[in-house]
Amino acid sequence: MARKIQKNKMWGGRFNTDQDKIMLEMNSSIEFDSRLYLEDIIASIAHAKMLGKKKIISSVESQKIISGLKKIKIEFEKGIFNLDPLLEDIHMNIEANLQKKIGNVAKKLHTGRSRNDQVATDMRLYMRKQCQEIIKKITMIQKELSKKANKYYDFIMPGFTHMQIAQPVTFGHHLLAYVEMLERDKNRFHDALKRINQSPLGAAALAGTTFPIDREMTSKALGFTNPMANSIDAVSSRDFIIEPLAAASILASHLSRFSEEIILWVSEGFDFIELPDSLATGSSIMPQKKNPDIAELVRGKNGRVIGALMSILVVMKGLPLAYSKDLQEDKELTFDAIDNILNSLEAINAIIKKLKPKKENLSSAAQKSYSTATDLADWLVSNLNIPFREAHKITGNIVRYCEKKKIKLSELTIKELKSFNKKINDDIFNVLDAEQSVNQKKSFGSTSPLMVKKSATKWIKKLQNEKK
């Protein structure tokens, strides 16, 4: 019985006793790395073609291996491939199944290859595909944000600092801030792809191989830019996972910030937007409740993305070159992070599509807390040639006066305003209203409706022209 299980192991020849149960359990990764079946088959086909082309195995053997791998691919797609947990991982499961299908010739597939470079190749193919998918979904969200910004370019709302009403802005301007953030996120993934897209295949365990393999051929066949130049680096590095997870963590922080704002905006304290019932849940005890769970879940799940990055960094920080089994920990963390970021992107897109801003509530809130005080100070500088620090002090005194009288800045009389500076004239009322405040903004990138409309139009055009 002890030898029966060992015979199932591709590496079992050197061992005389069975593995302990705990060793089998800890060593198995099939529960989570089975999702790499397609990458593993594609990479193995490229390797088999190269072995045949270089006459390391015969062309007949090469074709037989490739044919068997294609049959396995079909079985996975149909959901009829039986995974054996005793075979540890997806790589050994596929190879063992290939042996059942085509016999001993399957044993030649691993010529000039180790699981070390095999796993690294599969993971690079996986990360490349996932980064491309993330980029697509980011673009999808940017398009929705730009459309909404274009539609609501002149809806006045309060802008905040320290969670206190600060200055009037437009709803469209606020949404476009996230378009800009997401563009930087997208660029980080594009940049990471340059370093992900290098082939470790052929590095073998760590020292390369004595077989006359053609790494350029397999690299090209798999769509990589080039084969990696150092075999030790090829099998031991995981920065090709860490870098996109760092980008994903920054993206997650942006999605979480947006989610937090959605949660605030639908609350009774703000009541800025409305979400449909389809994106909310109720309470098991309070019949009146309509909760923004979708945004709360995004906010919560994105912590796992950041956590995955931290965990992999901790795994890597103490590993000597080249390969150690610690590296198996990268997969489960990575898969969870990628799943969560992709789901979060879908959720945020649904929120943006279906949210409806409440114009009157937004405008009313924008008039509160003396939000045009900065405009008043700027008017004193521009029209009365008062130094800004002095204008700041005068405006502060005016605000204190309004607080005492419980009135808005726009409700002040010219007589009251002149009591603070005799040179103040009726023109000052043009900047005391929130709508006038945003319309007066002139600087590039500002919140004026005209500027927001131009920016939204620019983004809509740019995103339409991007490659899908």
Segments predicted by a language model, with ranges:
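Short amphipathic alpha-helical segments with heptad-repeat character
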Residues: R124, R128-I135, T139, S146, ...
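Glycine-rich cofactor/substrate-binding loops
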Residues: A2-A43, N104-V105, Q288-K468
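Acidic, glycine-rich loop-and-beta core segments that form the ion-binding/anion-interacting portion
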Residues: L222-V314
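Glycine-rich cofactor-pocket loops
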Residues: N150-G172, I273-S284, Q288-K289, P320-Q328, ...
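Generic, well-ordered alpha-helical scaffold segments in large soluble proteins
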Residues: H47, G68-E75, N97, K101, ...
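A helix-coil-helix interface module used to build multimeric assemblies
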Residues: A2-G208, I213-S219, S278-S283, D293, ...
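Conserved hydrophobic residue
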Residues: I56-I57, F81, D271, I386, ...
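N-terminal, Lys/Arg-enriched amphipathic/low-complexity engagement segments
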Residues: T210-N226, P449-V452
